[in-house]
């Protein structure tokens, strides 16, 4: 282990090449600072402005810091290497390299101690906590504003009391000057700190904390002080070291003084700060030496000045205003050198500049192979110069390096021959910024080209997110053999076929290639040669050449196929010549059926083929196939001649009809509103939905129209009638229905800059042109889209960084942890539609236990077996609903994760290799799409993309209905109204296997009965999407309670219609008044309260803003609506709303209007209300539990009624639940599944696929800390948040000794907090809040075990992931073997000595 302070050891004594595996940070003692120093700096001068030599004893003194020139003393007496190590007797300078001026330190002996500002001002202030003082009081003492009593002596004062000048005078007069001792400044604080007996203070505080019962604040304060004392005791630091008596001066080369032209100098700010400090310190020394005695006030002022100048040096601006230079810019202090993007950590240690690199614009290289890139000749020569020199020498063309250099400058043909030899099989790395994921840097073999732009293979554009509109890329040359080997094996473009985010091919053809293949595989009626029969591909090519058939002719072709029994038979296949040409590219073999290519190729279809080729034939075949596919696509894209003009933009004829129909609908809603049947909000929502349906209908008609092609022109063939715009959209090559809809349909609804949708759509399209008004309302949304792009790119980039920070130290450490835990995975259902199948989710996972077919009971999956594509098909056929799989969340390894719990490495399709940095892969996979999506927001041009609000569930297939918890009543219209909050409608197939399930809302209408057979499309449940009803369970007469006009209920008149609505408002109540709880009671004919099925009175409490639907005294039937609560849906759903949601989840923030969830199973009761809160009491079913009380805000709608039975985890108030509540109530697995589903819902909305395991990795990092609930016999403090691994290890030791173990509970931290509280202080300091992290780490004497990626990059060691992981493992084995050999040898020697 290396102590961070030992980095400053005198260089001639330290072995700089010594390997280390840990770094420790401590507070430096005065003795240690002196031991680093090569001499005291006593003068503020820097260099002599005449001779330009450093001044003796100044800030650049050569005697202290070393010679300015290599092996030359200052006076010039000793020059050259032969005098190395001699100290010149004249000038006192040691003859050595000038490099030592980067390492040697000096020091200042301070005339008065100063308090280190990090320990004073970094909140919470460490010195104030240790002395149990107020921060303001501490500062008053340090800055000479008040005296502190050090020893009360015989006076009634107390130790630590503060006295002003007047109070001190008064006390001295009263009690005598010698009867008590006071102090002032940092010196007094140092004395107090030195007097602390930490161990006895710890014991006293532990007793005190046990006695504190009532005050939570006091308890936390004591615990905080106790934790700090534990840190000091554990680290061996002394509290008085927080006060500096000797100040180190950093080496001069790290604060350079550079000479500019015209004799001026540019200097580092640190020199000026040190100069001020030395001047003030020297003045103070002089004043202290004065025999006549200097007035106390003058001395104290000078001491204060020294303290202030030290504060500025350590952290300028930490206290009060920052000190500025002559240009009104704040001085850059030592802290500023470390902090932020321009600080030492991020600028120089994590982001280094790279030599042997170049940069140029990229152009397309369609002639290249997938593993190649085109490198400009001049650029290659510059990059490979050393290799060229070596090659010229090796071939005997040049005798020396100098000669080789001259030959290269002349540019003779030999140079280019040498370059061609050198670059052969020497991969280069191409990088495109922003480097969002590992595929943004790939290796290629360079091909020399004459141009000045780098040529890039078209298929890797998706991975780089590159296009050729001026993008630039950087080239890097891997120099060492190991680097070249890694580049070739791990980073070659041919080895990066699959996306690490979702396991799908990423070298998939796009744009023109897709269009070319789509055109090639089209089948058109009436083409020449239709119906002909062919027997070989030679015949096909011959027929095409002679124009006997066209590419799109429907023909028959004789070929071998695999029949249903799996036998290879000859058969006639209906196909087209184009499809047969595509089929020729498939690798030889029968694994892929011709049916796969015997259809019109879209982007999805092509992707599926590439995926199949990879799965069945491996990597090499896929690379060859992809290259052939690209060339074929480009060829036929060119031959097709597809382009579009105004004639291709066919506006649907039905558009005006749809407009008129929708306008009639809107008028109907206006009428309902004016008659008071619906509220303004409901009308708005209905209008928005009507126009959304209109745009959908127009879009459908438009697509039908352009699909039919040009039917009006005469004399065209069917091929000529094809519509280019339709072909582009249908093939998924370019554009989307949304964009075409704006072009030739209707632009549709528009969102304001606020996100709210304007209820008047743009009916025109861009082909017809917009009216002035339409243009006007469309502008704000479009402009916001462009402005958002810039802002959201930044937000997404920051999310990526935070994710990487939290997960960078997470690797695969072992093959198997042996756990039997896992997550139960089911299909994801939204609105009754399966959006993600079970098969998609379990692919690449490992089964926890054996899985059998539910019908045949045949074993499908064995325990510990990885689920591949074949197994997925078996799961689909067997109709299995859920599978328990191994998960990162349930892995039992203390460090990292095991391969079995992680499952398949998505970038290779095999089980993940040990040493893979799965944390970084996860962070990149989640962060990269966020950036992509935010950048793509503006493509739709401000058009609102909100879907129509769902109002029913329909059967997605034929099947049988099964109803769970069917609590419903039949209303006056003979409809079944659901009264249960846990009613579910299940759709099962003929065998009884569940296909999907729908959660029916309270108040919705059930249209089917249990066991009923339904056909696809049958409506099962319907509800009002714009209002939540409050429904009566019994028939009876309505009576209002606590409804006082103007107090708890108000008649609101709609200004536009004059209709009066009775709305519940927040009751205005004074203190001591009766609490009003507006509700509707139901009475029987005798005016007696009715009783509900749960035995309680029929009372329905009304939340604020609910609208009454009944009058007092009317007779209502069971199932009738008493009141309704309007729902407001107005936002557009896209990643712009979704990205903040993702951040909210990963930061574990409390949602704005969060839900309250039931902690136990129980029965709901309402207690006495407070002024603005409602009291809900949950009476547990289990009598051993205490009832739980919830205080709920009155304005929010409570989803349960009195007497309702709720289950653990049920929502009591609607909203997004707080993640910490889910963890507390439901546990880690439930929390994991909730976060995964919420985040996936956001990405799914944009069509982005990310594997669940990446989200699981991040959640695991959020759950790495636990809170101590009972410290047992450990040194932990109650409520302390510590690493789970540390607690488990401590408990093992305690258990072995028979002592009480520490008890703990899991806690969830946001990714930022998790990054800052990581075990590595180097990693945390380089992320955020550098000064605070380093202060904490120094006090606790933290040890960084260098386990993550960042800390190893910072200290310049190989990262412990990938190849580095195996290097470390080999080193461990070697070290162990060395120990064993040495031990054996020692034992042998000892034995020999004994015999002798």
From Swiss-Prot:
Family: Belongs to the RNA polymerase beta' chain family.
Binding of Mg(2+), residues: 467, 469, 471
Catalytic reactions of this protein: RNA(n) + a ribonucleoside 5'-triphosphate = RNA(n+1) + diphosphate
Provenance organism: Orientia tsutsugamushi (strain Ikeda) (Rickettsia tsutsugamushi)
Cofactor needs: Mg(2+); Zn(2+)
Any one Pfam family match given in the protein's UniProt record, by short name: RNA_pol_Rpb1_1
Keyword Acetylation carried by entry: no
UniProt entry tagged with the keyword Transferase: yes
CDD domains recorded: RNAP_beta'_C (cd02655), RNAP_beta'_N (cd01609)
Quaternary structure, from the entry: The RNAP catalytic core consists of 2 alpha, 1 beta, 1 beta' and 1 omega subunit. When a sigma factor is associated with the core the holoenzyme is formed, which can initiate transcription.
Name of this chain's protein: DNA-directed RNA polymerase subunit beta'
The EC number(s) this enzyme carries: 2.7.7.6
Molecular function terms from GO: DNA binding; DNA-directed RNA polymerase activity; magnesium ion binding; zinc ion binding
Any single GO CC term annotated in Swiss-Prot or TrEMBL for this entry: DNA-directed RNA polymerase complex
Keyword vocabulary terms for this entry: DNA-directed RNA polymerase, Magnesium, Metal-binding, Nucleotidyltransferase, Transcription, Transferase, Zinc
PANTHER family membership: DNA-DIRECTED RNA POLYMERASE, DNA-DIRECTED RNA POLYMERASE SUBUNIT BETA
Binding site residues for Zn(2+) 2: 817, 891, 898, 901
Cofactor binding note: Binds 1 Mg(2+) ion per subunit.
Cysteines paired by S-S bonds: none
Top-level lineage group: Bacteria
GO biological processes: DNA-templated transcription
Summary of the function given for this chain in its UniProt record: DNA-dependent RNA polymerase catalyzes the transcription of DNA into RNA using the four ribonucleoside triphosphates as substrates.
The gene coding this protein: rpoC
Binding, Zn(2+) 1: 73, 75, 88, 91
């Amino acid at each position: 282990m290396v102590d961070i302070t030992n980095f400053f050891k005198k260089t001639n004594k330290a072995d700089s090449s010594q390997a280390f595996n840990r770094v420790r940070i401590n507070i430096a003692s005065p003795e240690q600072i002196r031991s680093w120093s090569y001499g005291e700096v006593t003068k503020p001068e820097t260099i002599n402005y005449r001779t330009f030599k450093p001044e003796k004893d100044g800030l650049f003194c050569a005697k202290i810091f070393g010679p300015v020139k290599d092996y030359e003393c200052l006076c010039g007496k000793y020059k050259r290497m032969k005098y190395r190590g001699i100290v010149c007797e004249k000038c006192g300078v040691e003859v050595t390299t000038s490099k030592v001026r980067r390492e040697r330190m000096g020091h200042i002996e301070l005339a008065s101690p100063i308090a280190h500002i990090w320990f004073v001002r970094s909140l919470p202030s460490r010195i104030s906590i240790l002395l149990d003082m107020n921060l303001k009081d501490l500062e008053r003492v340090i800055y000479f504003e008040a005296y502190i009593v050090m020893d009360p002596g015989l006076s009634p004062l107390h130790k630590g009391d503060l006295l002003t000048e007047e109070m001190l005078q008064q006390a001295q007069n009263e009690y005598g000057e010698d009867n008590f001792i006071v102090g002032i400044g940092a010196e007094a604080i140092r004395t107090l700190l030195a007097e602390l007996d930490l161990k006895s203070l710890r014991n006293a505080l532990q007793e005190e904390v046990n006695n504190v019962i009532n005050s939570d604040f006091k308890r936390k304060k004591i615990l905080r002080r106790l934790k700090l004392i534990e840190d000091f005791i554990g680290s061996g630091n002394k509290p008085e070291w927080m006060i500096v008596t000797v100040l180190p001066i950093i080496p001069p080369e790290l604060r350079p003084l550079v000479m500019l032209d015209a004799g001026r100098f540019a200097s580092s700010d640190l020199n000026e700060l040190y100069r001020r400090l030395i001047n003030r310190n020297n003045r103070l020394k002089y004043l202290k030496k004065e025999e006549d005695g200097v007035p106390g006030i003058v001395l104290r002022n000078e001491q204060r000045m020294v303290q202030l100048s030290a504060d500025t040096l350590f952290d300028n601006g930490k206290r009060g205003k920052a000190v500025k230079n002559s240009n009104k810019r704040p001085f850059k202090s030592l802290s500023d050198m470390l902090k932020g993007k321009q600080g030492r950590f991020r600028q120089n240690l994590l982001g280094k500049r790279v030599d042997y690199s170049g940069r140029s614009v990229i152009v397309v290289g369609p002639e290249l192979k997938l593993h190649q890139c085109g490198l400009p000749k001049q650029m290659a020569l510059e990059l490979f110069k050393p290799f060229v020199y070596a090659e010229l020498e090796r071939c005997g063309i040049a005798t020396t390096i100098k000669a080789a250099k001259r030959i290269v400058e002349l540019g003779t043909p030999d140079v280019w021959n040498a370059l061609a030899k050198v670059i052969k099989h020497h991969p280069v790395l191409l990088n495109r910024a922003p480097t969002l994921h590992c595929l943004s840097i790939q290796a290629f073999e360079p091909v020399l080209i004459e141009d000045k732009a780098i040529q890039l293979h078209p298929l890797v554009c998706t991975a780089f997110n590159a296009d050729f509109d001026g993008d630039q890329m950087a080239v890097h040359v891997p120099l060492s053999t190991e680097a070249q080997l890694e580049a070739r094996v791990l980073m070659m473009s041919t080895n990066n076929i699959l996306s690490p985010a979702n396991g799908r091919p990423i070298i998939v053809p796009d744009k023109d290639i897709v269009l070319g293949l789509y055109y090639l595989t089209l089948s058109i009626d009436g083409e020449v040669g239709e119906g002909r029969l062919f027997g070989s591909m030679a015949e096909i090519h011959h027929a095409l050449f002679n124009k006997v058939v066209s590419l799109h002719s429907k023909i028959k072709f004789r070929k071998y196929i695999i029949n249903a029994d799996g036998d290879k038979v000859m058969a006639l296949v209906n196909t087209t010549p184009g499809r047969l040409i595509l089929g020729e590219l498939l690798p030889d073999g029968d694994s892929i059926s011709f049916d796969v290519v015997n259809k019109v190729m879209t982007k999805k279809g092509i992707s599926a083929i590439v995926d199949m080729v990879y799965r069945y034939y491996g990597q090499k075949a896929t690379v060859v196939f992809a290259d052939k596919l690209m060339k074929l696509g480009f060829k036929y894209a060119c031959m097709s001649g597809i382009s579009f003009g105004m004639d291709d933009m066919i506006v649907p004829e039905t558009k005006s009809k749809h407009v008129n129909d929708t306008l009639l609908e809107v008028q109907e809603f206006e009428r309902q509103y004016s008659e008071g049947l619906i509220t303004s909000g409901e009308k708005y929502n209905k209008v928005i939905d009507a126009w959304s349906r209109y745009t959908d209908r127009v879009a459908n008609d438009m697509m039908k129209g352009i699909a039919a092609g040009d039917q009006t022109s005469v004399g065209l063939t069917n091929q000529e009638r094809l519509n280019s715009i339709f072909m582009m959209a249908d093939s998924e090559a370019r554009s989307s229905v949304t964009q075409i809809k704006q072009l030739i349909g209707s632009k549709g609804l528009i969102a304001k800059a606020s996100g709210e949708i304007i209820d008047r759509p743009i009916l025109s399209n861009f082909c017809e042109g917009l009216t002035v008004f339409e243009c006007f309302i469309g502008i704000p949304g479009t402009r916001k889209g462009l402005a958002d792009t810039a802002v959201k790119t930044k937000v997404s980039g920051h999310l990526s960084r935070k994710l990487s920070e939290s997960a960078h130290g997470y690797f695969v450490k072992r093959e198997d942890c042996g756990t039997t835990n896992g997550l139960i995975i089911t299909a994801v259902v939204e609105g009754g539609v399966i959006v993600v199948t079970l098969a998609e989710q379990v692919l690449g996972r490992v089964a926890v236990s054996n899985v059998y077919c539910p019908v045949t009971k045949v074993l499908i999956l064995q325990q510990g077996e990885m689920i591949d594509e074949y197994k997925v098909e078996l799961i689909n056929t067997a109709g299995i609903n859920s599978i328990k799989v191994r998960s990162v969340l349930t892995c039992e390894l203390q460090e990292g994760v095991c391969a079995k719990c992680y499952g398949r490495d998505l970038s290779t399709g095999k089980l993940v290799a040990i040493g893979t940095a799965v944390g970084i892969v996860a962070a990149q996979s989640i962060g990269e799409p966020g950036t992509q999506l935010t950048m793509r927001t503006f493509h739709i041009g401000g058009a609102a993309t909100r879907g129509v609000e769902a109002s029913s569930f329909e059967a997605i297939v034929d099947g049988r209905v099964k109803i769970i918890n069917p609590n419903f009543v039949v209303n006056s219209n003979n409809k079944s109204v659901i009264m249960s909050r846990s009613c579910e409608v299940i759709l099962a197939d003929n065998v009884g296997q569940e296909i999907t399930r729908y959660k029916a809302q309270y108040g919705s209408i059930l249209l089917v009965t249990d066991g009923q057979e339904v056909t696809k499309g049958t409506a099962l449940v319907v509800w009002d999407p714009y209002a939540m009803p409050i429904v009566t369970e019994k028939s009876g007469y309505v009576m209002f309670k606590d409804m006082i006009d103007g107090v708890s209920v108000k008649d609101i008149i709609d200004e536009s219609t004059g209709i009066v609505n009775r709305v519940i408002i927040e009751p205005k109540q004074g203190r001591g008044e009766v609490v009003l709880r507006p509700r509707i009671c139901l009475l029987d004919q005798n005016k007696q309260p009715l009783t509900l099925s749960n035995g309680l009175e029929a009372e329905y409490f009304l939340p604020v803003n609910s609208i009454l639907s009944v009058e007092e005294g009317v007779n209502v039937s069971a199932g009738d609506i008493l009141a309704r609560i309007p729902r407001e849906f107005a936002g557009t759903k896209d990643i712009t709303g979704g990205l903040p949601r993702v951040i909210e989840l990963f930061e574990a923030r409390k949602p704005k209007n969060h839900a309250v969830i039931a902690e136990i199973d129980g029965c709901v009761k309402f207690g006495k209300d407070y002024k603005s809160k409602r009291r809900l009491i949950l009476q547990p079913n289990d009598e051993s539990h205490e009832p739980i009380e919830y205080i709920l805000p009155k304005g929010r709608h409570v989803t349960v009624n009195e007497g309702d039975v709720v289950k653990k985890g049920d929502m009591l108030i609607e909203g997004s639940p707080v993640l910490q509540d889910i963890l507390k109530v439901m546990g880690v697995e439930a929390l994991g599944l909730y976060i995964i589903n919420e985040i996936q819902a956001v990405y799914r909305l944009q069509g982005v696929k990310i594997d669940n395991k990446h989200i699981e990795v991040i959640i695991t990092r959020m759950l790495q800390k636990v809170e101590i609930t009972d410290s047992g016999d450990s040194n932990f403090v109650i409520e302390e948040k510590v690493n789970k691994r540390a607690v488990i290890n401590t408990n093992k030791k305690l258990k072995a000794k028979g002592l009480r173990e520490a008890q703990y509970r899991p806690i969830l931290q946001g990714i930022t907090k998790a990054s800052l509280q990581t075990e590595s202080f180097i990693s945390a300091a380089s992320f955020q809040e550098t000064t605070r992290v380093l202060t904490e780490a120094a006090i606790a004497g933290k040890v960084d075990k260098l386990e993550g990626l960042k800390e190893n990059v910072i200290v310049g060691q190989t990262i412990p992931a990938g190849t580095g992981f195996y290097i470390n493992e080999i080193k461990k084995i070697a070290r162990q073997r060395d120990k064993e050999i040495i031990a054996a040898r020692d034992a042998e020697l000892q034995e020999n000595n004994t015999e002798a």
